[in-house]
Structure formats: C-alpha cells, structure tokens
C-alpha cells in the first residue's frame, strides 16, 4: 500500500492538521484483511496470528512516526480481527477483552504504546522537517531537528529484500527498539531486511524502548483526586 496520502505535506497543507489512521468504523479492520487475504511465501504466513501481529506492528511503526495527529479505533491496539459484517455492518460489535490474554496481541499492545510514548516524548517525531518514501515495498521516513535525526525503515514484502534508509549522515545510529547500534559508512547504501523487519534509528542514543503493558501498570501506585473537596463525608 501507498502511505503517502497520510502525510499532510502530500496534500499541500502547511500545518499538521491531517488526522491519519489505519482503521475506522466503516471499513474492514486491517487485522481482518491480513488474516483473510494475507500473503504467504514459504514459511512466512501473514495469516498466522503471530505474523499478523508483526505486520500490524510494522504498519504502526510508520503510522505513529508520520508527524501529525492520529486516530485509533476500538481494540485496534489488540488486533481486532472480526469482520465489519459480523453480525452486520451497522450492528454493535463484540467487546473482546479476552484478547488481552493473548501473548501475541499483548505484544501488539505494548509496541503500540511504546511507539505512541516515543512520538510524545521526543520532538524529532513532531518536526516539520522530514522526507519520506512510502509507496513501495521498502518504506522510510527521515526526520530531523537541530539536535537529533531519526530514520524509520521497513520491509513490507513477504520475502527478504533490500531497503533504502537514506540515512541523513554516516556514523553511529542507535536502534530504539532493540537497544543495538549500527555504524553507517555509506548513507545511501541498501540494507537487506527479513520480511516484515523494521527499525527506528536515531543518531542520539535515546536508550531502549520500554515495553510496558497493563499488567505492569496496574501494580504501580495510583493517584486519586476527590471532588468536591472538602466533601460531606460520603464518596460515591
């Protein structure tokens, strides 16, 4: 798929007012499409739950690093894969809290949360200074602010293939989601990625992404605010 129409610049807009999304209420869910129509090559089968989740994470790596506001739809962060016609197009849809018990779906949740936290924490993902190539099997986004550069790159094939990060410069780049680093000696040289492989590189060491889910959050201290304060002694 070609993602560039999700970039506000592609429409000639000067402000980041384009709300982009990968799922909505009036179309089949992307997880459903992958599960039903996904491609297969040898042992790489996108219709399997684990691989479907990998493809969703790959897509989210680009959705959430395109600067501008985003929308997510009900249980998208857990890979909701029921058809829009189940039971009918305008019927109420099943609320599937049980999805969170799935290790694979929980992984999608954690990566989605980490990507959102990353874009909210680091200014490079809010910049106006970025270029992109989003219309092929090798996709990339290059973002820059004065003190940080970021390059997002992924292989959308179901086979190994070359990707073209077009790093902003040579030198050491840090992989935010693995904690590893690479030394780039040729900024325009291709890299060979496995099917569905993706990376978010920065030229400043931001540390390694923290993948935290609801299990971890619920054991952390909570703050509760009461209103009105003072009260009449009864809290409902």
Label every model-predicted segment.
Residues 148-150, 198, 232-234:
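Intrinsic-disorder/low-complexity, polar/charged segments enriched in Ser/Thr/Lys/Arg/Asp/Glu/Gln
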Residues 185-213:
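C-terminal beta-strand-rich structural cap/linker in extracellular carbohydrate-active enzymes
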Residues 90, 95-117, 165-186, 193-198:
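C-terminal accessory region downstream of the catalytic core in glycan-modifying enzymes
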Residues 51-55, 103-111, 229:
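Soluble or luminal CAZymes and related metallo-dependent hydrolases
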Residues 215-236:
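Surface-exposed, proline-anchored Ser/Thr-rich loop/turn motifs
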Residues 1-85, 120, 124-165, 175-178:
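Conserved alpha/beta catalytic core and glycan-binding cleft of carbohydrate-active enzymes
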Residues 10-11, 143, 190-191, 216, ...:
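Short secondary-structure boundary/capping segments
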Residues 134-137, 185-189, 231-233:
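Ser/Thr- and Asn-enriched, surface-exposed coil loops between beta-strands
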């Amino acid at each position: 798929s070609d993602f560039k129409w999700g970039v506000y610049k592609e429409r000639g807009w000067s402000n980041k007012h384009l709300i982009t999304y990968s799922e909505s209420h009036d179309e089949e869910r992307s997880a459903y499409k992958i599960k039903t129509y996904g491609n297969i090559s040898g042992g790489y089968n996108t219709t399997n739950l684990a691989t479907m989740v990998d493809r969703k994470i790959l897509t989210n790596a680009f959705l959430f690093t395109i600067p501008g506001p985003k929308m997510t739809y009900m249980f998208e962060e857990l890979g909701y894969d029921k058809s829009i016609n189940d039971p009918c197009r305008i019927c109420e849809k099943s609320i599937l809290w049980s999805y969170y018990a799935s290790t694979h779906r929980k992984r999608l949740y954690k990566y989605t949360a980490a990507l959102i936290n990353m874009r909210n924490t680091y200014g490079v993902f809010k910049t106006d200074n970025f270029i992109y190539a989003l219309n092929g099997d090798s996709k990339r986004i290059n973002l820059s602010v004065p003190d940080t550069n970021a390059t997002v790159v992924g292989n959308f094939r179901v086979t190994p293939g070359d990707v073209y990060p077009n790093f902003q410069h040579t030198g050491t780049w840090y992989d935010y989601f693995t904690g590893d680093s690479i030394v780039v000696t040729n900024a325009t040289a291709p890299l060979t990625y496995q099917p569905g492989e993706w990376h978010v590189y920065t030229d400043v060491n931001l540390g390694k992404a923290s993948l935290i889910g609801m299990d971890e959050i619920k054991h952390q201290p909570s703050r509760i605010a009461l209103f009105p304060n003072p009260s009449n002694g009864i809290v409902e």
